[in-house]
Structures are given as structure tokens and as C-alpha cells.
Amino acid sequence: MNENTKVIKGRTGDWEMVLGLEVHAQVASKSKLFSGAAVGFGAGPNEQVSLVDAAMPGMLPVLNRFCVEQAVKTGLGLRAQINLKSRFDRKNYFYPDLPQGYQISQFDQPIVGEGVVSVERDDGTTFDVRIERLHLEQDAGKSLHDQDPNATYVDLNRAGTALMEIVSKPDMRTSEEAAAYVKKLRTILVYLGTCDGDMEKGNLRADVNVSVCRPGDYEKFRATGDFKHLGTRCEIKNVNSYRYIQQAIEYEARRQIEILEDGGKVDQETRLFDPTKGETRSMRSKEEAHDYRYFPDPDLLPLVLDPAWVKSIEETLPELPDAKKARLQSQYGLSAYDAGVLIIDADRADYFEAAAKGRDAKLVANWVTNELLAKLSAAGTEFTNSPLPHTDIAQLVELIENGTISSKIAKEVFEHMWAGEGRPAEIVEKRGLVQINDTGAIEKAIDDLIAGNPDKAEAVKDKPQALGWFVGQVMKATGGKANPGTVNELLRKKLGVE
Amino acid sequence: MSLTNLTLKAAIDGLAAREFTSVELTRAHIEAIEAARGLNAYILETPDKAIDMAAKSDARRALGEAGPLEGAPLGVKDLFCTNGVRTTACSKILENFVPTYESTVTSQLWRDGAVMLGKLNLDQFAMGSSNETSYFGPVTNPWRAQGSTKALTPGGSSGGSAAAVAADLCLGATATDTGGSIRQPAAFTGTVGIKPTYGRCSRWGVVAFASSLDQAGPIAKTVEDAALLLTSMSGHDPKDSTSLDIPVPDFTQFVGKSVKGLKIGIPKEYRVDNMPAEIEKLWQDGIAWLKEAGCEIVDISLPHTKYALPAYYIVAPAEASSNLARYDGMRYGLREEGANLTEIYENTRASGFGDEVKRRILIGTYVLSAGYYDAYYLKALKVRRRIAEDFDNAWTQCDAILTPTAPSAAFGLGENSNDPIAMYLNDVFTVTTNLAGLPGLSLPAGLDANGLPLGLQIIGKPLDEATVFSVAGAVEKAAGFTAKAEKWW
């Protein structure tokens, strides 16, 4: 049994949850999947709509090669099979924000097949989520129901935008794992440059499949692949934050358990998560489910990829998070945790690597992942927009390394750097923060201190832990600039502490 | 002789020889159209635009910039979107639709100097074989049986195109063919029509019926005229993913070319029950003519032919049911109000589509539905594959195939309109080429006992319109078909 499975206590015994996700990622592309219309956030309603997007009579789709390249790149990044032949199908249903009356999608021949994503839990352990498939499809427009009490407005700017639907197998067992998976997937997509990962704008959103079962059932499912061992699943549509994903799952699992414990049965259905109430509610049942009447889109030829083209894409793949993490650990001797924090986005890792050149890498990693990251997060910005260039962090660490300043002083210097007072060396110079390494000056301070406190100097011989008081006093007397190592060493000698 | 009696080729030659101007030629056609309104071939006349285009054409010619169709007035089937000119597909749902774009095919005609006379009637959304499903009423065939005044169908769906060409209301017309909609009307009106290889003509800007079957093509007075028009209409269009990126030859150079040594296949499966003896005889005449011209006649078998019509009437409605989903009253076209969204959809589509269109949407929706998809749609796709293989096999034995175009001559308006199956049977000889994507041409080859025209069909290999035109040219020459509908309108 997976020790990470969370047992949910019920009245009738223990339960576990089984989770699978369908993540919709908007393809980073300047134009739409089948029309030349621009893609962009913030344009006025219906300003980015071509004749094709509006489904005018006689208009035809033409596949955007760049979007295909992005999907292939993503597939390679998910260590998945690239299907050299795939097909586009029509998914038929009526809705005002779907101008064609069908969505062009890929039904039984997706462009990308099975793959795997390695995901880190918060405690640093990892688990694999198997990818079932990735397919390309068009997004719909937006229906605006809140503009007029008697009318719905439709904005077709998003209609026809390319989406990648990435379907996982039911390999997640806790809501934390589900969120961690989406985080990791997002990191990979952003590394690849195939999706901007902006969840607030809805450019990355998840449909979450939740079911519950008794302990042991999941293992039977994994051994046989037979879904009969699992409970009936409900699909929660369009959840667009990590927090909501977790909340929705927790609520939904509880809801299903209560139904089952009351002797009822879970209906397979599509549900919506209401973030204000923290609840899921029924959207449509299996009986009400649409018959989408999928069939091959006769306006488009089967998509056939040249293996050489796929290979050329593979050759241009950037270093992906897992590889980068392993390299940071081996090349710089970083801890798994620090490496994990640094690889969350590629810019962060790049910043670190630039700053670490010729410096104590672990020390640089500490400064980058602690002080600087905290400041940037508080300022709501990221490493690409850091007001402090990597050369400043490198210089700060150099000053520590060569003994010019102590780590403690460095923190003070850092505050001044962040306040925009200049480069670290200038600040140290200007503010007179250079460490006192002069033994004579420190010795004098120690001698004065012992002379003024003979009883304490006597007591410390039996109680060496009281040495700290002396250190503090010496530092105080030197304005914090005394080299702490030297202070310690001299104190021990003069006080006779081993 | 009136200017409207000229063939397209003769008219272009006359324009080139400065015997008359495009404005004169166009005006003669406008007058003929006005005098023939009883035929209901044009549902929209654009005389001002025509004269304007003709004047510009004359100006170009004066500058020595004449295109291959310079100054030739043509009619346009109202399935082709025309920029700023109402395009209805002869439906109520698009009754007032004015496109802001021009179909690729028509834009190529205008590029080559042609002049637009107006928009031609058709079966609603090209669904029909008699032009009777048009929201604007049926077209009347200019031909009548000898001694009869009974109104006959010009066939469909390109009934307006065929009637306009037959009645000299244009020098040629655009048409489309999904299951025979160019060739059957051509056969019923004594005109020439060709559906080229699927992908020859761009479908961009043509209101879609069944995307995998729809092809544009011309209806014309002679084989040479058809070749002239098809040359201009064809060509790769990056806006249509199914358009073929293959050079287009000048098809006219193949008309009149010797057919000596060509092998002509005669498929035994096209000898259907109850086929009129006159059609069988015409077929034999065609065989004899080609033999005389030096062709070798080969008996061939296309064993899956009998499944073609049922397969067609599954695939075409399936695609149509999806293609016509966009007519929902939301963005353009007819909108009928309702208490909620579903009612708006229901009211709009109930009111906007005619019965035949609704029938096909329902059939198409049914065959794609869960539980029926495999038995109908998927099976039909398999049949389609078998039919294409039949032709692949045939091409190992012959260079072109000769068949009748339609199982009867033009029938009376109203005669089949309550019997969809009888109506669908009109397509029995023509649907196979749509299913297999092959070029097919119909040309008039004789008259039946009532003096009504009958057509023969020549089917070619994929992209081998050249041979089709050569064979058609030979049959045309041998048949010496010169009959015209006697003017009564």
C-alpha cells in the first residue's frame, strides 16, 4: 500500500480517494488553431475574431503548424509517445459561444499518446503520474451572463484558440498530490514555452475526476487495469487554482463517502465547483450527457508528421525541470530541497547559475532561495524582473567568502541593496560595515570586558554555554563588525574555555 | 444571330476580334434574363454590377490586358459567396445574408476577366435533384416534351445554372456537385457539366453541404467551354486544407485531341433495372462512337456500385447535419425569437430550413448517434473505401469509363417531390465519383422520343480531367448534338 494514501475515516470504515485530471492548457501561440486570427488577452470583445472563428458560411479551418509543433514539444516534454498520424474530429453540440455548432478536437487518434510525469510531494518524495494522452482542440468563446438581465452576450475572442488537453491516468491519491501534479505539469509547460501557465486568466485549468474506494481496491485496479475495482467517478469541471483543486477534491470525496455510507450510490455526473461556498454541485447527469456525435472532420486531412521534423523539435528541447534539478544537485552540491526550489522556474535556476559562477554555490543558493526569493515574492515579482542583478548576489557572497563581512552583516547589506543603495561593496564601504579582523582591536575589547566582569569570567569556566554572552557583548562593543570566528577563538583562549 | 446564342469560346473570340464589346454582350444577356424570369433561373439579377464589370473589362481589353475569360458574362450558383451580393443557398435561413468575402472559385473567374450577371437558383443548400427544394421556388426547364406545355424540372441541385446555360441566359455558370448536382442537371438540359477531381477547386467560400463530397465545377454549352471555365476555376488554395497543390493544365488543349488507343471501360453494374431503352441505346451509341474514334472498349466491373447510393445518403447527411449546425440564429441569418435558448434554436431552425434539409439533418444526426454510428456511418465509410477500390481496380484495365448520366430524362415538376427515394435514385450513376473523388463529366448525346436531351457521363482517373475532356470532345463531335430548347418563355 502506498503510504502516501490518505485514509478517510468513515462511519462504516476507511475510505481512500482516487483522482485523475484532465488539464486544459492554452497553447502559447500568436494565432488560433485553425484561423489566422490573433490570440491575446485584453482585447475588446469580439476584436480578435476571423470569418472562420465566427463560422461564416463557406469558411474552412486550416491547421496552424506552430500549434502542432507546440503539442509535439509538450508530448516530448511529458516523455510521451508522439503519434505520427493523428486526426481531427468534430464534437457536435449547440451553444452560443460555439459558432460552428461543433468543436474541432481529437477523439480516438490524438497527437500524443502515453507518457509520464514525475511529481514532487511537499516532503520531497516523488511519485509518477502516467499520462494517458494529449490532444489538440479548439477553445470556445465566452458567454457573458451578467451584462444584461434579459440577454447573454457572447465574446468570440477566445473561440478557436488552441488548447492542449492533457489527460492523466487515475494515479493521484490525495488532493495534495493532485495539486502537486498540476504544479509540476505547469512547470514543464512553462519550461517548454508551450503554455504560459497563467491560471488566473484561465490559460491552465483542470477537470478533476474524483472517486472513492475501500483500502486495497486501488491496488487491485492497478494490478488488473479493471475500473470495476474503483468507485463511480464524478468530474468537476474547470477548476483554475491549486487551492480550489484541493478544496473541490476534499469536498467531493466527503460527499461521495456520505452517499455511500447512507447506502446510496454515486451517480456518474459532471459537477461544478463553487469557490464561494466551497462546494461542488451537479451540472448534468450521465443521462443528460450530450451525445457529441464525434466524427472525422471532413474539412481537414489526417495529420501526418515527418519523423525528422519531430526529431528536430526534440533536439531543440530545453533542459527540463527533472534534468535541471539533478544537474544542480550534482554540479553544485545543492540539497534536493534547494534544487527543487530553484527549478520551479527556469529563470530562477538561470539566475542562480549566473550568480554562482566562481562562488560558493551552496551559499549563493541560500541567498537566492531565502532572502531574495522572499523579497521578490513579497513584491509580487519574479527573478526575470529582479531589481538586483545576479552580479550583486555574487558580489555579496564574495564579500562573505573573503571575510570582508559576516553573514550577519551581509543581511544588513542585503537590506540596503534591496533599498536601492547601490552595489554590495559600495554599501559596505559607505556604511563602514567592513568586518574587524584586526586581532588587536578585538583583544582590547575582550580584555575590557573581562576586566569589567571578573565574576562572569570566572563562572564561564564551569559553564561554557555562557560564552554566548561574552560573544554578544564583544559584538556589541564593535558595532557588530568583529569577525565572529576571531571573537570566539580569542574569547576561548582568554577565558580558558575549551 | 443573337449574341446570347454564342458559345463562351465564340464570344471570347468575338470580343478579342473587337466584333462587339463586353458591355454589348452583357447587355444582351441582361435583356435575355429579364425576358426569361418565368424560368426562375436567377434568384438575384445584378445588372448594374454586370455592366460595371463589363465596362471595366472593355477598358482592360483596350489596354491589352485581357484575361482568358475577359468580358464573358457568367451566372453564379447561389451557393458561392459573393462579396457584397446576397448569398442565400436558396434557403430562408440565409434569405438576407450578404457576405463580406468572395469565394475562391468566383474570385478566380473575375481575376480572369469574367462578368457576373447574377445569382442562380438551386435546391436549398444543394439538397435535391429537381430544384424544387429551393426557398425561392423551382426552376423550370427550358426544355419541354414535344407537343407538351408541361413544366419539367431542370434537375438539381444546380438547376438554375443548367437552365440559364440552356436558355442562353449566360455563357456559362458555376455549379457544385455533391452527388451529381452538376451532371444530372446538365443531362436534363442538354448542357455540359463537369465535376472535377475532389480538391481541384477550392471549397473556400462555398456554402458547405457535405465537405468530403462537395466540388465546384462549371456548366457550359460545349465541352470546350467547360474546359475553359474549369481551367480558371481550378487551382490550389491554402485556405482549403483539402485543396490539391497540383498544377492546373490548360484543359482546352485536350478537347479535340485524338482518343485513339484509349481504353474505355463499360461497367456492367450501371445497367440498372427499369432503365429506359432509349438510355441504353444512347449508351450503345456512345460506345460505337468511341470505337469509331479508335478507342478500345473494355467490359469492367465495379461490384460495389449498388451500395453507393445508400452509403452516399449516410455520409452526405452526416456531414450536412454538422455543417449546417452553424445556422443557429446567433450571428447572422434568420433568427426567430423564443422564451429561452433552446426555443430560439428550435424556432429559428424549424422556420429557416425546408423539409428536405430537415430530413437530411435528421438522418445525419441519427447515423452519427451513439449506438448507430458503427452500423451506419462507419459502415458507409467502409463501403466508400470499397467503391474507391473498385475504381482503382478498373484503372488497371481502362483509361476512362463511359456511363449514362441519369436513369431518366427530365421529369415533371412535382412528379417525385413526395417520394424522396425516387428522387434520390436520380443520383445512382453520379454518386460513385463523388464517393471516390473522381472527375466526372456529362455531355448531351441525344434526344429521347419526346425530344428531351439525354446525357452521357465520362469518368476519369484522379486528376486526369485531361483524358475526360479528350473523350468528351470525341463523343461531342460524333454525337453532333446541336438541339436547343425551343424558346417559349
From Swiss-Prot, chain A:
Superkingdom as given in the UniProt entry: Bacteria
GO biological process entries: glutaminyl-tRNAGln biosynthesis via transamidation; translation
**SUPFAM superfamilies in alphabetical order:** GatB/YqeY motif (SSF89095), Glutamine synthetase/guanido kinase (SSF55931)
EC no.? Answer: 6.3.5.-
As one GO molecular function, the record gives:
asparaginyl-tRNA synthase (glutamine-hydrolyzing) activity
Which Pfam families does the protein's record reference? GatB_N, GatB_Yqey
Reactions accelerated catalytically: L-glutamyl-tRNA(Gln) + L-glutamine + ATP + H2O = L-glutaminyl-tRNA(Gln) + L-glutamate + ADP + phosphate + H(+); L-aspartyl-tRNA(Asn) + L-glutamine + ATP + H2O = L-asparaginyl-tRNA(Asn) + L-glutamate + ADP + phosphate + 2 H(+)
Q: List residues traversing the bilayer.
A: none
Q: Which SMART domains match?
A: GatB_Yqey (SM00845)
Keyword annotations for this protein, in alphabetical order, are:
ATP-binding, Ligase, Nucleotide-binding, Protein biosynthesis
What does this protein do, in the record's words? Allows the formation of correctly charged Asn-tRNA(Asn) or Gln-tRNA(Gln) through the transamidation of misacylated Asp-tRNA(Asn) or Glu-tRNA(Gln) in organisms which lack either or both of asparaginyl-tRNA or glutaminyl-tRNA synthetases. The reaction takes place in the presence of glutamine and ATP through an activated phospho-Asp-tRNA(Asn) or phospho-Glu-tRNA(Gln).
* Subunit comment: Heterotrimer of A, B and C subunits.
Write down the PANTHER family for this protein, in alphabetical order. Answer: GLUTAMYL-TRNA GLN AMIDOTRANSFERASE SUBUNIT B MITOCHONDRIAL AND PROKARYOTIC PET112-RELATED, GLUTAMYL-TRNA(GLN) AMIDOTRANSFERASE SUBUNIT B, MITOCHONDRIAL
HAMAP family listed in its UniProt record: GatB
Q: Which family does it belong to?
A: Belongs to the GatB/GatE family. GatB subfamily.
Name-wise, this protein is: Aspartyl/glutamyl-tRNA(Asn/Gln) amidotransferase subunit B
The opening ranks of the lineage are:
Bacteria, Pseudomonadati, Pseudomonadota, Alphaproteobacteria, Caulobacterales
Gene (UniProt): gatB
Swiss-Prot record, chain B:
- Which species is listed as the source? Caulobacter vibrioides (strain NA1000 / CB15N) (Caulobacter crescentus)
Q: Which BP terms does GO give this entry?
A: translation
Q: Which family does it belong to?
A: Belongs to the amidase family. GatA subfamily.
UniProt keywords, alphabetically: ATP-binding, Ligase, Nucleotide-binding, Protein biosynthesis
The record's catalysed reaction(s) read: L-glutamyl-tRNA(Gln) + L-glutamine + ATP + H2O = L-glutaminyl-tRNA(Gln) + L-glutamate + ADP + phosphate + H(+)
Q: What is this protein called?
A: Glutamyl-tRNA(Gln) amidotransferase subunit A
Q: Does the keyword Nucleotide-binding apply?
A: yes
Q: Name one GO cellular component term.
A: glutamyl-tRNA(Gln) amidotransferase complex
